[in-house]
Amino acid sequence: MTYPNLLDRFLTYVKVNTRSDEHSTTTPSTQSQVDFATNVLIPEMKRVGLQNVYYLPNGFAIGTLPANDPSLTRKIGFISHMDTADFNAEGVNPQVIENYDGGVIELGNSGFKLDPADFKSLEKYPGQTLITTDGTSLLGADDKSGIAEIMTAIEYLTAHPEIKHCEIRVGFGPDEEIGVGANKFDAEDFDVDFAYTVDGGPLGELQYETFSAAGAELHFQGRNVHPGTAKEQMVNALQLAIDFHNQLPENDRPELTEGYQGFYHLMDVTGSVEEVRASYIIRDFEKDAFEARKASMQSIADKMNAELGSYRVTLNLTDQYYNMKEVIEKDMTPITIAKAVMEDLGITPIIEPIRGGTDGSKISFMGIPTPNIFAGGENMHGRFEYVSLQTMERAVDTIIGIVAYKG
């Protein structure tokens, strides 16, 4: 189905800079997200028909569309995030490419281009309307496509009361891209049986498995002396960091793994001979493998300290989120419904693990099972990001189908 306000709504959203800031200590991490929620989303939530609309100190804009059929007793939530990733989000100037011809798309005058030779996903979209960047910023389809789709679904349901639906709760939240947006989510206030994050990629994505995730902060303490007299005196912290890294499995890196394979990822290293700080992330799907990865890092640190005869390697491990499969597989109702709706719409469900996390990873462990459905974005987090309007329309269809489902 086509929705006349969907494209303009999306274009309005992406032109607002809502980039999050991992170094901030506030919630939300940037004032622009507060302004976007209170000045743009809250008024529009009311206009499209949501009731009891409010903004919480945790950064979430919340609203409700009451059920219009007493036989549909479920309460279902839909959640998308306002923030965009760590890439330029100022001056977003989207291009609308109607009836895409399958060829190269020049991204404004930036010198960058979307070429099917480099981005095979483009081969799926001839004849469709694509929204791209102008090459100077990201687009923000992650996850403003999700926000636009949820808002459009509510607008359509309000205008078509003949479509019977259950109670719907909507939540637009902050700081998903920096991994803290759902930390303060109020599950008791949201009060639904289950929810969906509308934060996936291509048409048909339906995901209920995520990584389990941890962060590892390492400090290597060296001893700097003049290199000319360094023998048996100098301890080079840079070398300690290299030695530590070289004891991790060589092939367990993001660029060498896929599917259900986990990894260690060195994110940042700073320092000198005297001291070095290094940051890693640890990812795996199975709980035992996840715990084993953390234990392995601790074992390496302990072994190095024992060999050095002093405590020169300090490791701090912090769990970040867990595989939501552990919660959702106890009651697969949200997956069963979404899968059935997609199939009824002629959409082939693509059920595969997310090699990452969503707000649903944390919300599921707060008592609300929250799988993820497609929002349409491709090449997210950079200048090559784009989305198909037709895929966004199918996401709206899917949301409407889920809340009207009577099985």
UniProtKB/Swiss-Prot annotation:
Question: Which amino acids does the record list as binding Zn(2+) 1?
Answer: H81, D142, D199
Q: Which GO terms describe its biological process?
A: peptide catabolic process; proteolysis
Protein's UniProt keywords contain Ribosomal protein: no
According to its UniProt record, the EC number is: 3.4.11.4
Return one GO MF term.
tripeptide aminopeptidase activity
Q: Keyword Hydrolase: yes or no?
A: yes
SUPFAM superfamilies assigned = Bacterial exopeptidase dimerisation domain (SSF55031), Zn-dependent exopeptidases (SSF53187)
Q: Which reaction does it catalyse?
A: Release of the N-terminal residue from a tripeptide
Q: Which CDD domains match?
A: M20_peptT (cd03892)
The record's listing under InterPro entries reads: ArgE/DapE_CS (IPR001261), Bact_exopeptidase_dim_dom (IPR036264), Peptidase_M20 (IPR002933), Peptidase_M20_dimer (IPR011650), Peptidase_M20B (IPR010161)
| Record note on cofactor | Binds 2 Zn(2+) ions per subunit.
Q: Locate the active site.
A: D83, E176 (proton acceptor)
Q: Which UniProt keywords apply?
A: Aminopeptidase, Cytoplasm, Hydrolase, Metal-binding, Metalloprotease, Protease, Zinc
Chief place where the protein resides: cytoplasm
Cofactor(s) required, per the database record: Zn(2+)
Q: Record's superkingdom?
A: Bacteria
Output a single Gene Ontology CC term carried by this record.
cytosol
Supply the enzyme class, top level. hydrolase
Residues that coordinate or bind Zn(2+) 2 = D142, E177, H381
Q: What does this protein do?
A: Cleaves the N-terminal amino acid of tripeptides.
Protein name, UniProt field: Peptidase T
Source organism of this protein record: Streptococcus pneumoniae (strain ATCC 700669 / Spain 23F-1)
